[in-house]
């Protein structure tokens, strides 16, 4: 990020000062590219999208992963990663409340270390009446356990209120798992609409409608296959080449 998600009064001043010591930049999204040029109009940089993570094991079938997590429901949705205010977990909880009775037979996995008071989310879940459908793991997940959460899931949901880019989408793509994301920041840049996922407004109504439509379309296997092809463009070699080009200029 150029500017932190939770902004501070000194961010702009400190960023400008810090960038004065930088020779060149690699930006991972067009949003960050625009932010960089607003600070350093003549910046020397390369644009290279966030690569797909390839460090996670992908050895479990959906059935095996669900068994390990003790999930018996047919539908599984995943919210994964650090839980901070800008991640919009409240949006997702409120969305699930709206479609709770319609969706049926589902589990929402909330997995990630909470950088806020988790009690507020526990209270939201209770008030939404979806406690029985939500499995929470409010702590860091080591690399060797990441796979079971993604392998068990039909879709990864990112209801972010702001975003530069997302490593979570690229983990989802590693497991050929589709995504539903907010149309903010750099997130739409890495989603092929209707083929690898869906982009919607960051509101509970929009996410409720998108999640309901996702399951009504019943084309998860097609999305999985699309992602398998689409993700090849997000390679680590491309980023290495971008860095080498900067260094060799």
Annotate each predicted stretch with a short phrase.
Residues 57-71:
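A short helix/loop element that forms part of the nucleotide-sugar donor recognition site in Leloir-type
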Residues 71-87, 93-96:
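Conserved donor-binding/catalytic core segment of Leloir-type glycosyltransferases
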Residues 121-140:
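Nucleotide-activated donor-binding/catalytic signature segment of Leloir-type glycosyltransferases, i.e.
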Residues 178-181, 191:
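Short hydrophobic beta-strand element within catalytic cores of glycosyltransferases
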Residues 193-194, 198-205, 211-219:
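Conserved acidic donor-binding segment of nucleotide-sugar-dependent glycosyltransferases
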């Amino acid at each position: 990020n150029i500017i932190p998600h939770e902004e501070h009064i000194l961010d702009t001043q400190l960023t400008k000062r810090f960038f004065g010591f930088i020779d060149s930049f690699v930006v991972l999204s067009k949003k960050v590219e625009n932010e960089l040029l607003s600070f350093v109009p003549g910046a020397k940089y390369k644009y290279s999208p966030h690569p797909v993570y390839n460090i996670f094991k992908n050895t479990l079938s959906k059935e095996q992963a669900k068994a390990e997590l003790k999930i018996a429901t047919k539908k599984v949705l995943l919210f994964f990663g650090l839980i901070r205010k800008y991640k919009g977990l409240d949006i997702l909880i409120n969305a699930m409340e709206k479609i709770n009775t319609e969706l049926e037979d589902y589990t929402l996995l909330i997995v990630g270390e909470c950088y806020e008071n988790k009690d507020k989310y526990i209270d939201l879940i209770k008030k939404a009446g979806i406690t029985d459908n939500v499995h929470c793991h409010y702590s860091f997940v080591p690399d060797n356990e990441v796979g079971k959460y993604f392998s068990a899931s039909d879709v990864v949901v990112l209801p972010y209120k702001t975003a530069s880019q997302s490593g979570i989408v690229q983990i989802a793509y590693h497991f050929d798992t589709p995504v539903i994301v907010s149309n903010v920041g750099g997130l739409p840049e890495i989603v092929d609409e209707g083929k690898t996922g869906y982009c919607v407004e960051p509101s509970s109504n929009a996410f409720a409608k998108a999640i309901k439509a996702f399951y009504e379309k019943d084309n998860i296997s097609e999305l999985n296959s699309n992602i398998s092809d689409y993700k090849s463009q997000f390679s680590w070699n491309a980023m290495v080449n971008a860095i080498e080009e900067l260094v060799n200029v």
